[in-house]
Amino acid sequence: MEGWQRAFVLHSRPWSETSLMLDVFTEESGRVRLVAKGARSKRSTLKGALQPFTPLLLRFGGRGEVKTLRSAEAVSLALPLSGITLYSGLYINELLSRVLEYETRFSELFFDYLHCIQSLAGATGTPEPALRRFELALLGHLGYGVNFTHCAGSGEPVDDTMTYRYREEKGFIASVVIDNKTFTGRQLKALNAREFPDADTLRAAKRFTRMALKPYLGGKPLKSRELFRQFMPKRTVKTHYE
């Protein structure tokens, strides 16, 4: 653990008069809680580097639940997020903070996170495809296995024109019932490919990931959604989060 690790800060808060308490996501150790001693002091060179969306190299150690930051270096400048992409980045940071246990390795998820942040930084349109892909990747890493390509009842491949209702712990079963848990075969194929060519498949992906993530998040609302509603135009909030 004393070696250098690639990492991102998910969240930070003041700790004592001159230090910071950090929630970081690392390549090798997963999510880790760190104390950055003296990081808030006037002479500290760390303050500017220990920010969300800045690619970092960190070295830390300690035996308790809270580790001590030994060294930190910014690999590059913070990825340029602003407006809707900034709130999207804050959303995925909060998502990781809520669903990942401390010190559980998720090396592949780390690169999914990096790819998502890079996609948000380069987005020229809606950030939603990048968010949905990351949510689906996160669910996969958490062990949430779902077969999007075959009917769980018959075993037959899904048909674009048929509808399938999701049943927890079973999968998608052909159904004539139309409700919030019902998806078309076309939508399921889009979820499986993680490609969303139109508004219909994007809405379906959001509906599924919200439903699938709910048990992990519990009843506590996400703060990033509330911030988004407060500071972004109402039309943007409606299309992005509702």
Curated annotation (Swiss-Prot):
Keyword DNA repair appears in the UniProt entry: yes
Source species, domain of life: Bacteria
Gene3D superfamilies: Nucleic acid-binding proteins, Recombination protein O, C-terminal domain
Coiled coil region boundaries: none
Keywords: DNA damage, DNA recombination, DNA repair
GO CC, one annotated term: bacterial nucleoid
GO biological process: DNA recombination; double-strand break repair
Subunit organization: Monomer.
NCBIfam families in the record: reco
Biological role: Involved in DNA repair and RecF pathway recombination.
Similarity remark: Belongs to the RecO family.
Protein's recorded name: DNA repair protein RecO
Name of the gene: recO
